């Protein structure tokens, strides 16, 4: 079933609306160095898909993107912020629960190949990994077992990337630069979005065999302008809006659906 209701998050060069529909896309990665519009673009993607059949959860070391969702969703434990106490351990617990839910959905498929019909009872679960590279760095520095903890998270995220899309458990990774150490399982990302980059190797890591003129254009993009590739299609250039953060918070409050069952209940073991 094709669900509708997602709102445009950008406008392309031809003046056409760019819409992200999580029930149709799969995993998403967005990258861009500081002050390129990546944060505003991420906000636009989120508010464009605050729908009853889309359930957000996630980890945000800087707390900006996911703080309003944590506050207004009615599911505070489904969002881990860097300002939370014991946030690293809570983040690992959340990812473990995401994999558990994914396994439950796979087990319930029966003879079906994938979930085709999403609803408020069975929503697409979008797992946001904001500042994923910073998250991995924090894991590695988390005590004597930091390296093992980082490896555990990479394994959990990799499992979601390889197995989650068919049952509506999707990863939305946000990076400054696409590098092999953080863009593991890169072939699993269907939608790839970039704002300005300062590293040509990162562009080649994100997009498959970009042309030299495309690379030159990406390294010189002005703030708010970006490019995307959807399932290997030709690059599509776009412009995203630039609302104030207060507008983002207000829009989340107005649009967010509060009836989803939390992935993590308080005191979840």
What are these regions (language model features)?
Residues 1, 5-6, 138, 187-193, ...:
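Conserved P-loop NTPase motor module
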Residues 212-225:
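Conserved C-terminal "switch" segment of AAA+ ATPases
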Residues 1-110, 119, 123-126, 133-202, ...:
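P-loop NTPase catalytic phosphate-binding loop
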């Amino acid at each position: 079933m094709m669900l509708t209701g997602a709102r445009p998050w950008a406008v392309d060069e031809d003046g056409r609306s760019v819409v992200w529909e999580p029930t149709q896309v799969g995993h998403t990665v967005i990258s861009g160095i500081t002050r390129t519009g990546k944060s505003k673009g991420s906000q636009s993607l989120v508010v464009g898909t605050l729908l009853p059949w889309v359930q957000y959860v996630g980890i945000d070391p800087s707390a900006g993107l996911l703080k309003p969702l944590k506050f207004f969703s009615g599911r505070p434990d489904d969002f881990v912020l860097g300002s939370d106490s014991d946030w690293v351990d809570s983040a690992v617990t959340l990812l473990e629960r995401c994999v558990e839910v994914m396994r439950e959905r796979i087990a319930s498929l029966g003879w079906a190949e994938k979930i085709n019909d999403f609803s408020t009872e069975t929503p697409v679960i979008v797992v946001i990994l904001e500042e994923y590279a910073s998250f991995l760095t924090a894991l590695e520095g988390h005590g004597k077992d930091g390296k093992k903890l980082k490896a555990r998270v990479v394994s959990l995220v990799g499992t979601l990337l390889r197995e989650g899309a068919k049952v509506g458990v999707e990863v939305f990774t946000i990076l400054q630069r696409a590098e092999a150490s953080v863009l593991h399982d890169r072939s699993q990302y269907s939608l790839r979005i970039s704002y300005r980059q300062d590293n040509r190797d990162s562009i080649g890591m994100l997009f498959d065999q970009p042309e030299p003129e495309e690379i030159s254009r990406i390294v010189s993009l002005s703030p708010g302008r970006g490019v995307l590739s959807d399932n290997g299609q030709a690059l599509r250039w776009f412009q995203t809006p630039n609302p104030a953060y207060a507008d983002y918070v207000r829009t989340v409050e107005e649009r967010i659906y509060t009836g989803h069952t939390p992935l993590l209940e308080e005191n979840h073991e």
